[in-house]
Amino acid sequence: MYSKIKGYRNMLNMTQEELGGKLGLTKQAYSNKERGKSEFTDREKIQIKELLQPMFPAVTIDDIFF
């Protein structure tokens, strides 16, 4: 699952620090979530989906996180 999130982040051409910043997270907090040490909140999942929609209009939260 977490490699999918990293893959989508790479498709956005963003670093962990950049994507974390868009979510209101520090680089370390985002890194912990991407590596599965803590969970993304529902709000963060929605924000990531919204960032991906211009590139992948049909993407779902399930596609990204499950």
Where are these regions (language model features)?
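Short basic helix-loop element that most often maps to the first helix and adjoining turn
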Residues: S3-K22
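Residue-level recognition of specific faces of alpha-helices
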Residues: K4, A29-N32, D63
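Acidic-residue sensor for enzyme active/binding pockets
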Residues: Q16-E17, E34, E44
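Recognition helix of helix-turn-helix/homeodomain-like DNA-binding domains
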Residues: L25-F40
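DNA major-groove recognition helix of helix-turn-helix/homeodomain DNA-binding modules
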Residues: R43-V59
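Short amphipathic recognition helices of helix-turn-helix/homeodomain-type DNA-binding modules
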Residues: T60-F66
